[in-house]
Amino acid sequence: MHETAAAPAPAGFVPWPDDVAARYTAAGHWEGRSLGTHLAEAARKVPEAVCLVDGPVRMSYSELMARADGAAVRMRGLGIRPADRVVVQLPNCWEHVVVTMACLRLGALPIWALPQYRHRELSGVVTHARASALVVPDVYREFDHQALAHEVAEAQPTVRHVLVAGSDVRPDSVDLRALCEPLDADEAARVAAELDRSAPRGEEVAMLKLSGGTTGLPKLVARTHNDLSYMIKRAAQVCGFGRDTVYLAVLPLGHGFPNTGPGVLGTLLAGGRVVISGSPAPEAAFALMERERVTATSVVPAIVMRWLQYRDERPGADLGSLELMQVGASRLEPEVARQVGPKLGCRLQQVFGMAEGLLCLTRLDDPDDVVHYTQGRPISPDDEIRVVDPEGRTVGVGEPGALLTRGPYTPRGYYDSPSANARAFTPDGWYRTGDLVRRTPDGNLIVVGREKDLINRGGEKINAEEVEGFAVQVDGVLQAAAVGLPDSELGERICLFVVLADGTRVELADVRKVMENAETASFKLPERLITLPSLPTTPMGKIDKKALRAAAGRMSET
């Protein structure tokens, strides 16, 4: 029998207070078992059902667990131990799912990283996390990830192994596909029982998520088996996931949203099927929806707009199986939201979440005005919300303010980041999200901007998202982003970047007219409009205001 002692909490982990943890346990939110155990138990209920589709690969639950458990014991054979950090930088592929589950079964901590990361980002994550292993493709989109991983590993003494998926695995790398070969039936049963016995406890850290911040390198968020299992299960319940669910994973699996919101892991916990797409392009996604009879997916607003436009141009694809489309990561304009149901034939669900915990969803039975105009409400009855003014006083219903939260799946601090914790968390455990929201009488949140997303024009503080909200009311404007244009007289003037529908033309005067008709203060009117084919995004998929400010700054110099 191979049993391991409980893995020590990473040195930088901030636990919930004992009395709070006891309350969440008594409420039934925290079950005291590992996420890997929950996934294994779900798989045993439907062993022959197909659970994972990736191109020609069609994997049953029994095969998935035979591969994940096989990978777990082989990783252990490499010297990877519980609480070791494993950076997973893979594109959307079946190996991403298997190696994540292997880590969860072993007790190692996966850290999902985007394939777009290069030396600066990847080395930053590896160094901060003190990672033991890197998991990468050999080459992806003509970039040699294997070479980069070894370059990073050579500079970070904690990294002992580079695991590589692909056909060109170097002798000094570990062949990931060989590592993920399935155990035979007898061996699978023996290893499964062994891993069940040595599974991490619920209060132990399950994974480190990367924060979605746009300043500097992402921070690390330590999520426990208790809190993460509860969040995923509760989200799956709100979304109505079950054995008939067929989830299309079209967003990069380097993000948390398509994995845990409820996403891939929520689908597997519910006994459903995950279909992996390597591209969000409508041609590829619609073909998979039609072939696999997809019932649910999660996307970002930019993808929604591409899909709607494609649907207008080519209405032939059979999307009749699609029941639910989650949209999150950035604000979905109501004008776009209203088109989803009529054009794509499915229910829209707005999503507002963060790596730090809080997850808000509109509900399947919400009226259309709630779904179109709000970003939903927290999924747990024990999620706590405060909306406050700059002095920390609670504002009234409908008034904008800064969002603070705490709850059974919102950790009490970042991993090993005391200075960030001092800024982002109050002494009594409230997380300062940095979001500006309004709370409706029925408890839904409307995200109106970011606390730092303000333009200072001659001392007047202008919320950029307010300007953007007016801009997208102009016919032909698909996306808008307002930033401050440096100005020697006023400090900043308002510069508006827009993305237009094909064949349309929009002038600055068109936006100003909409704002003037709404009797908006004159100091909020944009003074420059720039059309782009697309808005730049951060590695976490959010609109990159820093890049736009830099572009605006260069323009002010010419």
Swiss-Prot record:
Reaction equation(s) it catalyzes: 2-hydroxy-7-methoxy-5-methyl-1-naphthoate + ATP + CoA = 2-hydroxy-7-methoxy-5-methyl-1-naphthoyl-CoA + AMP + diphosphate
CDD domains assigned to the protein according to its UniProt record, in alphabetical order: 23DHB-AMP_lg (cd05920)
Residues reported in the UniProt entry to bind ATP: 212-213, 329-331, 351, 435, 450, 542
Keyword Transmembrane appears in the UniProt entry: no
Enzyme class, spelled out: ligase
Pathway: Antibiotic biosynthesis
Domain of life: Bacteria
Keywords in alphabetical order: Antibiotic biosynthesis, ATP-binding, Ligase, Nucleotide-binding
Any Pfam family hit: AMP-binding
Gene Ontology biological-process annotations: antibiotic biosynthetic process; fatty acid metabolic process
SUPFAM superfamilies per record: Acetyl-CoA synthetase-like
MF (Gene Ontology): acid-thiol ligase activity; ATP binding; medium-chain fatty acid-CoA ligase activity
Assigned EC number: 6.2.1.43
Known function: Catalyzes the activation of 2-hydroxy-7-methoxy-5-methyl-1-naphthoate in the biosynthesis of the naphthoate moiety of the neocarzinostatin chromophore. Also catalyzes the activation of other 1-naphthoic acid analogs such as 2-hydroxy-5-methyl-1-naphthoate or 2,7-dihydroxy-5-methyl-1-naphthoate in vitro.
UniProt family annotation: Belongs to the ATP-dependent AMP-binding enzyme family.
The protein, known as: 2-hydroxy-7-methoxy-5-methyl-1-naphthoate--CoA ligase
